[in-house]
């Protein structure tokens, strides 16, 4: 079992039950999944760009990403319906906790001028979205092999009903929010 998973079961559940006065342990919010999405706009003209993005996401997450395709044709972007334009990966269970642990303890502190992640990026239903400007903050990505600096979206989906519950859960898990 992962370090964060143990911390959740031993400490966080008790702390959340005390703070929000839940009747049952099953009411305590937990992390359901983490979705990492990488949009690759250059994939329209350069198919190698998408291959690199898929490779990087595989290294980061430990599983093969799903290639996302365009839903509509947009002439201004020279985009046809069904063209591959990105990659996403959904993490659950053990890999999800491993990734969150790595993100919070290793990767986010490596961001230049890092003062914490925004408190306003909750969606009203207890999910948190985080944008990363470059994939180089992750230690597994080799700087020399990177052809282009790409960002990604990381969505943490929780079972929390309110943003306040989700914020408390992520804070207890170690997410460095801005003061």
Curated annotation (Swiss-Prot):
<dbReference type="GO" id="GO:1990904">
    <property type="term" value="C:ribonucleoprotein complex"/>
</dbReference>
<dbReference type="InterPro" id="IPR031309">
    <property type="entry name" value="Ribosomal_uL5_C"/>
</dbReference>
<dbReference type="Pfam" id="PF00281">
    <property type="entry name" value="Ribosomal_L5"/>
</dbReference>
<keyword id="KW-0687">Ribonucleoprotein</keyword>
<dbReference type="InterPro" id="IPR020930">
    <property type="entry name" value="Ribosomal_uL5_bac-type"/>
</dbReference>
<dbReference type="GO" id="GO:0000049">
    <property type="term" value="F:tRNA binding"/>
</dbReference>
<keyword id="KW-0820">tRNA-binding</keyword>
<dbReference type="GO" id="GO:0005840">
    <property type="term" value="C:ribosome"/>
</dbReference>
<dbReference type="InterPro" id="IPR022803">
    <property type="entry name" value="Ribosomal_uL5_dom_sf"/>
</dbReference>
<comment type="subunit">
    <text>Part of the 50S ribosomal subunit; part of the 5S rRNA/L5/L18/L25 subcomplex. Contacts the 5S rRNA and the P site tRNA. Forms a bridge to the 30S subunit in the 70S ribosome.</text>
</comment>
<comment type="similarity">
    <text>Belongs to the universal ribosomal protein uL5 family.</text>
</comment>
<dbReference type="InterPro" id="IPR031310">
    <property type="entry name" value="Ribosomal_uL5_N"/>
</dbReference>
<dbReference type="GO" id="GO:0003735">
    <property type="term" value="F:structural constituent of ribosome"/>
</dbReference>
<dbReference type="InterPro" id="IPR002132">
    <property type="entry name" value="Ribosomal_uL5"/>
</dbReference>
<dbReference type="GO" id="GO:0019843">
    <property type="term" value="F:rRNA binding"/>
</dbReference>
<dbReference type="InterPro" id="IPR020929">
    <property type="entry name" value="Ribosomal_uL5_CS"/>
</dbReference>
<dbReference type="Pfam" id="PF00673">
    <property type="entry name" value="Ribosomal_L5_C"/>
</dbReference>
<keyword id="KW-0689">Ribosomal protein</keyword>
<comment type="function">
    <text>This is one of the proteins that bind and probably mediate the attachment of the 5S RNA into the large ribosomal subunit, where it forms part of the central protuberance. In the 70S ribosome it contacts protein S13 of the 30S subunit (bridge B1b), connecting the 2 subunits; this bridge is implicated in subunit movement. Contacts the P site tRNA; the 5S rRNA and some of its associated proteins might help stabilize positioning of ribosome-bound tRNAs.</text>
</comment>
<protein>
    <recommendedName>
        <fullName>Large ribosomal subunit protein uL5</fullName>
    </recommendedName>
</protein>
<keyword id="KW-0699">rRNA-binding</keyword>
<dbReference type="GO" id="GO:0006412">
    <property type="term" value="P:translation"/>
</dbReference>
<keyword id="KW-0694">RNA-binding</keyword>
């Amino acid at each position: 079992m992962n370090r964060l998973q143990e911390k959740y079961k031993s400490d966080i559940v008790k702390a959340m039950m005390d703070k929000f006065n839940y009747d049952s342990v099953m009411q305590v919010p937990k992390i359901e999944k983490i979705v990492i999405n990488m949009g690759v706009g250059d994939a329209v003209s350069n198919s190698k760009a998408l291959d690199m993005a898929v490779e990087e996401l595989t290294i980061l997450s430990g599983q093969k990403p799903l290639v996302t395709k365009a839903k509509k044709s947009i002439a201004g972007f020279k985009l046809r319906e069904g063209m591959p334009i990105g990659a996403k990966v959904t993490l659950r269970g053990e890999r999800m906790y491993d990734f969150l642990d790595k993100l919070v303890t290793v990767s986010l502190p490596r961001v230049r001028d890092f003062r914490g992640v925004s408190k306003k990026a909750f969606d009203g239903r207890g999910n948190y979205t985080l944008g990363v400007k470059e994939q180089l903050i992750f230690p597994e990505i080799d700087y020399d092999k990177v052809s282009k600096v790409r960002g990604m979206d990381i969505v943490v989906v929780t079972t929390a009903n309110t943003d306040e519950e989700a914020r408390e859960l992520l804070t207890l898990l170690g997410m460095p929010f801005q003061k």
